[in-house]
């Protein structure tokens, strides 16, 4: 049995450098838990001159970690999609274990990698929610269960912005600037605020929970950029919080996947998750509801998850990458058949008969109102009507909103948020 495992590390940014730091600082406990010594033999970076003072070789030759026979595990922390995918394919072709934190690459290529890998281990715990061990929970801890549903706060940036808007009455623009100033949001935050990052993670979790190969373009994805303080005020008034959720539900003949802002009751555990923290609620048919909470990003939480994969590979505890012997064939639920309650915000002319017009259109689409709030806009002839509905379907609600937008008394495109009970 080998007494030492050698790592080829691709990328020495925030996460990569923290992996190196933890492997050095915690080397004794890692050795005790892995059963072997784990050392970085070589790291590959774009600019060798910027990375000095390490006890291992620094190279700018990506092929060298693949071809080096002394390297047992390649750890990819470079970012991007196609270049990491090519690295993964070449690594697995050499029957070397591969560890990645790359959610975007896995969202597009997870099934191809599983087919290439065969019995060669692939670790990707760090790809979803950083320090939360949700991958292992779905693959191992909950493997005796049918996963009935899961929903979660999968993106820390959007959760921080929504928390600031809810607690401090900040505008979306100001909350985003604050997140960027603190380093929680990128200068180009599009993937975070538009729900794409959360959707990447949802697809990976859905593969583990249901064995399906869903594509990004097949699922409903909406971001948080259209949410305004008025929406937060309505939520507070009626006992809700607003969170960007990734949601999965198993129906008898299909799987429902969606990412969007959701109003959730304050009694719901996820409503208490604030700031940059992540959390996922999973319901199994035997275990019931379980909740997983923790830091979803950052150098140390993500590096911790990367090293947990390395230790698991060192223990030779390999298993099917996505947890299913054969791909499952359940289709995705069509977007227009989604059923939930809804909230909408309308800017209208402040005149008689407007609300009766709105009520009539909702009734014609078999939509019944639950709560209503009307706000006059001072020194204008305009008002805002905010309302929530009882459960209906997506097709009916979208049709009603389209008809409402065509009313002369409705002055702007209606805004909508789904309620997740």
From Swiss-Prot:
The residues that the entry says bind NADP(+) are 15, 46, 103, 183, 186, 298
Ordered alphabetically, the record's keywords are: Amino-acid biosynthesis, Metal-binding, Methionine biosynthesis, NAD, NADP, Oxidoreductase, Sodium, Threonine biosynthesis
Task: Report the source organism.
Answer: Helicobacter pylori (strain J99 / ATCC 700824)
At which positions is NAD(+) bound? Answer: 15, 34, 44, 298
Name the source's superkingdom.
Bacteria
Q: What job does the chain carry out?
A: Catalyzes the conversion of L-aspartate-beta-semialdehyde (L-Asa) to L-homoserine (L-Hse), the third step in the biosynthesis of threonine and methionine from aspartate.
Q: What is this protein called?
A: Homoserine dehydrogenase
The residues that hold NADPH are 15, 46, 103, 298
* InterPro entries cross-referenced by the UniProt entry: ACT-like_dom_sf, ACT_dom, Asp/hSer_DH_NAD-bd, HDH, HDH_cat, HDH_CS, NAD(P)-bd_dom_sf
Name of the top EC class for this enzyme: oxidoreductase
Transmembrane region(s) = none
Query: Which positions fall inside the ACT domain?
Result: 343-418
Its cofactor is:
a metal cation
Its Enzyme Commission number?
1.1.1.3
């Amino acid at each position: 049995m080998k007494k030492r495992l050698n790592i080829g590390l691709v990328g020495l940014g925030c996460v990569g450098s923290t992996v190196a730091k933890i492997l050095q600082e915690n080397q004794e406990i890692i050795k005790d838990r892995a059963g072997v010594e784990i050392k970085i033999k070589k790291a590959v970076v774009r600019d060798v001159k910027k990375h000095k003072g390490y006890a291992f070789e620094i190279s700018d030759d990506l092929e060298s970690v693949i071809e080096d026979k002394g390297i047992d595990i390649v750890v990819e922390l470079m970012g991007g999609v196609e270049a990491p995918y090519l690295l993964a394919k070449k690594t697995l072709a050499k029957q070397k274990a591969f560890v990645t934190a790359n959610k975007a690459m896995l969202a597009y290529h997870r099934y191809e990698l599983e087919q290439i890998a065969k019995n060669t281990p692939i670790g990707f715990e760090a790809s979803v929610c950083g320090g939360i061990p949700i991958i292992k929970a779905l693959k191992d801890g909950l493997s005796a269960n049918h996963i009935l549903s899961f929903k979660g706060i999968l993106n820390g940036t959007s959760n921080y912005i929504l928390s600031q808007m809810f607690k401090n009455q900040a505008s979306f623009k100001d909350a985003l600037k604050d997140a960027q100033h603190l380093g929680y949001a990128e200068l180009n935050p599009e993937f975070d605020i538009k729900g794409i990052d959360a959707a990447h993670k949802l697809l990976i979790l859905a593969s583990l929970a249901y064995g399906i190969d869903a594509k990004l373009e097949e699922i409903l994805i909406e971001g948080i950029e259209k949410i305004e303080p008025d929406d937060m005020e309505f939520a507070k008034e009626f006992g809700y919080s607003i969170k960007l959720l990734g949601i999965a539900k198993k129906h008898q003949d299909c799987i429902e996947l969606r990412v969007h802002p959701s109003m959730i009751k304050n009694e719901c555990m996820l409503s208490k998750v604030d700031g940059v923290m992540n959390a996922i609620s999973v319901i199994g048919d035997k275990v019931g509801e379980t909740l997983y909470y923790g830091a979803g990003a950052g150098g140390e939480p993500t590096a911790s998850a990367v090293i947990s994969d390395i230790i698991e590979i060192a223990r030779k505890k390999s298993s099917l990458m996505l947890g299913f012997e054969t791909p499952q064939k359940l289709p995705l639920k069509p977007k227009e058949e989604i059923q939930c309650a809804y909230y909408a915000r309308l800017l209208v002319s402040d005149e008689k008969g407007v609300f009766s017009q709105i009520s009539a259109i909702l009734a014609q689409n078999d939509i019944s109102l639950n709560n209503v709030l009307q706000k006059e806009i001072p020194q204008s002839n305009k008002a805002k009507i905010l309302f929530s509905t009882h459960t209906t379907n997506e097709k009916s609600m979208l049709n009603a909103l389209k008809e409402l937008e065509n009313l002369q008394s409705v002055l702007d495109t209606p805004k909508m948020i789904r309620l997740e009970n």
